[in-house]
Amino acid sequence: MGSFSIWHWLVVGILVLLLFGKGRFSDMMGDVAKGIKSFKKGMSEDDAPTPAPKQIDAQRAPDLSATPTPTAETENR
């Protein structure tokens, strides 16, 4: 039960031949090859350099930190 016998492999082979047949399998491999070629062609077209991003002159943001102001309590101490 742990390994497959020759009969198991024969049944699997017959099922594969029935499902895919002689012409279907070669057609599928041709379609896969066309897809790979198309993918490679698309990847080679994307190698065009992209323009550098624009440099924006940044201005320093105003300092919004809280500064303590004197109050009546702190003046009396």
From Swiss-Prot:
Keywords: Cell inner membrane, Cell membrane, Membrane, Protein transport, Translocation, Transmembrane, Transmembrane helix, Transport
Subcellular location: Cell inner membrane
Superkingdom, natural source: Bacteria
Disordered: annotated span: 41-77
Positions of transmembrane segments: 1-21
Gene Ontology biological process terms from the UniProt entry: protein transport by the Tat complex
Family annotation (Gene3D superfamilies): 1.20.5.3310
GO CC, alphabetical: TAT protein transport complex
Pfam families in UniProt: TatA_B_E
Membrane topology, record value: Single-pass membrane protein
One of the record's GO molecular function terms: protein transmembrane transporter activity
Predominant subcellular localization, coarse grouping: membrane
Biased composition (Polar residues): 66-77
Chain's role: Part of the twin-arginine translocation (Tat) system that transports large folded proteins containing a characteristic twin-arginine motif in their signal peptide across membranes. TatA could form the protein-conducting channel of the Tat system.
Subunit structure: The Tat system comprises two distinct complexes: a TatABC complex, containing multiple copies of TatA, TatB and TatC subunits, and a separate TatA complex, containing only TatA subunits. Substrates initially bind to the TatABC complex, which probably triggers association of the separate TatA complex to form the active translocon.
Family recorded in the similarity comment: Belongs to the TatA/E family.
Protein name as annotated: Sec-independent protein translocase protein TatA
Gene name, Swiss-Prot/TrEMBL: tatA
